């Protein structure tokens, strides 16, 4: 606990908060090109084959991004849009690919939570 005179002399240091998505450089999204598209296994106690892509961004950064939803059409050289948001059970995956933007197609036959997966509203039958 500092004294009043110590505070007058030095003041208090403000602690700068670290960014959770540093490669975005304060932008909401960034464009990038897939260099590798593969599957990986999550940490214990979970078990699955999670789809991920290594993406080279327009600012030169290379990041690992998660491909959400069931099925995807991404391959090497696909142009994708990246947003922040980590995947808790995949170490080092701190970004998500935006479905339905650029080369990434929306999830087919998705009825609920469509806006998060780039799925169009289905046609109504009369």
From Swiss-Prot:
<feature type="region of interest" description="Disordered">
    <location>
        <begin position="1"/>
        <end position="23"/>
    </location>
</feature>
<keyword id="KW-0699">rRNA-binding</keyword>
<comment type="subunit">
    <text>Part of the 30S ribosomal subunit. Contacts proteins S8 and S17. May interact with IF1 in the 30S initiation complex.</text>
</comment>
<protein>
    <recommendedName>
        <fullName>Small ribosomal subunit protein uS12</fullName>
    </recommendedName>
</protein>
<dbReference type="Pfam" id="PF00164">
    <property type="entry name" value="Ribosom_S12_S23"/>
</dbReference>
<keyword id="KW-0689">Ribosomal protein</keyword>
<keyword id="KW-0820">tRNA-binding</keyword>
<comment type="function">
    <text>Interacts with and stabilizes bases of the 16S rRNA that are involved in tRNA selection in the A site and with the mRNA backbone. Located at the interface of the 30S and 50S subunits, it traverses the body of the 30S subunit contacting proteins on the other side and probably holding the rRNA structure together. The combined cluster of proteins S8, S12 and S17 appears to hold together the shoulder and platform of the 30S subunit.</text>
</comment>
<dbReference type="GO" id="GO:0019843">
    <property type="term" value="F:rRNA binding"/>
</dbReference>
<comment type="similarity">
    <text>Belongs to the universal ribosomal protein uS12 family.</text>
</comment>
<keyword id="KW-0488">Methylation</keyword>
<keyword id="KW-0687">Ribonucleoprotein</keyword>
<dbReference type="InterPro" id="IPR005679">
    <property type="entry name" value="Ribosomal_uS12_bac"/>
</dbReference>
<dbReference type="GO" id="GO:0015935">
    <property type="term" value="C:small ribosomal subunit"/>
</dbReference>
<comment type="function">
    <text>With S4 and S5 plays an important role in translational accuracy.</text>
</comment>
<feature type="modified residue" description="3-methylthioaspartic acid">
    <location>
        <position position="89"/>
    </location>
</feature>
<dbReference type="GO" id="GO:0000049">
    <property type="term" value="F:tRNA binding"/>
</dbReference>
<dbReference type="InterPro" id="IPR012340">
    <property type="entry name" value="NA-bd_OB-fold"/>
</dbReference>
<keyword id="KW-0694">RNA-binding</keyword>
<dbReference type="InterPro" id="IPR006032">
    <property type="entry name" value="Ribosomal_uS12"/>
</dbReference>
<dbReference type="GO" id="GO:0003735">
    <property type="term" value="F:structural constituent of ribosome"/>
</dbReference>
<dbReference type="GO" id="GO:0006412">
    <property type="term" value="P:translation"/>
</dbReference>
